[in-house]
A protein has these predicted regions:
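Cleavable N-terminal export/targeting peptides
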Residues: 1-25
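Predominantly the C-terminal beta-signal and adjacent terminal strand-loop region
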Residues: 61-66, 123-158
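Short glycine/proline- and aromatic-enriched beta-strand/turn motifs that initiate or cap beta-hairpins
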Residues: 19-60, 68
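Transmembrane beta-strands of outer-membrane beta-barrel pores
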Residues: 34-38, 56-62, 75-77, 99-105, ...
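Repeated loop/turn-to-beta-strand initiation elements of outer-membrane beta-barrel proteins
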Residues: 40, 49-52, 80-83, 124-127
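Outer-membrane beta-barrel strand-turn architecture
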Residues: 46-48, 77-79, 103, 120-124, ...
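Residues on the lipid-exposed face of transmembrane beta-strands in outer-membrane beta-barrel proteins
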Residues: 32, 40-44, 71-75, 97-99, ...
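Residues that define the transmembrane beta-barrel architecture of outer-membrane proteins
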Residues: 26-28, 34-36, 50, 65-69, ...
Length: 158
């Protein structure tokens, strides 16, 4: 029952952010994420400094299957970009908070994420890369602290 409630809250959060991003109509990036998880990544800019990102990853093997989903609200800081005086590129730090859910064969996992990262993009190209470190606090089925890391590439549609 507890897992169902947490999963329902997670899905409601995603639907809320998808409605906000739909009204924005710009700044949607789709791409790949490697390592934590490995799968598909999406990022939707809400304004110049705030974005919502998410990822979906699958792990399939003969004896084990899992589906990984996360969503984060991110704040981007422009001070590094201003210090380096980059003319044709953007290098920004970001941090935020979010949730992750891992659906497994035997034990579903629900946790809090606190991503800290760096994003780089060229002003004349619709591509962006990112690198992030993520302290994670799993709260279900048992409390556990861990670190994850990921790199990725996104193509921006608008």
């Amino acid at each position: 029952m507890k897992k169902s409630i947490i999963t329902a809250l997670f899905c409601c959060t995603l639907l809320t952010f998808s409605q906000i991003s739909y009204a924005q109509q710009s700044g949607v990036g789709l791409g790949a994420i490697l390592n934590g998880p490995t799968g598909v990544s999406v990022k939707v800019w809400l304004n110049e400094d705030f974005a919502v990102d998410g990822a979906l990853g699958l792990q399939l093997s003969e004896n084990f299957q899992s589906v990984y989903i996360h969503s984060d609200v991110l704040y981007h800081n422009n001070s590094l970009n201003e210090e380096l005086n980059l003319n044709n590129a953007s290098l920004r730090t970001y941090y935020g908070a979010g949730l992750r859910v891992i659906f497994q064969d035997f034990n579903d996992v629900v946790g809090l994420r606190l991503p800290i990262g760096l994003t780089y993009s060229l002003t004349n190209a619709p591509l962006g890369t990112f690198f992030e470190l993520v302290p994670t606090f799993d709260i279900e089925p048992a409390f556990q602290f861990s670190f994850a890391g990921a790199i990725g590439l996104r193509y921006y549609l608008n």
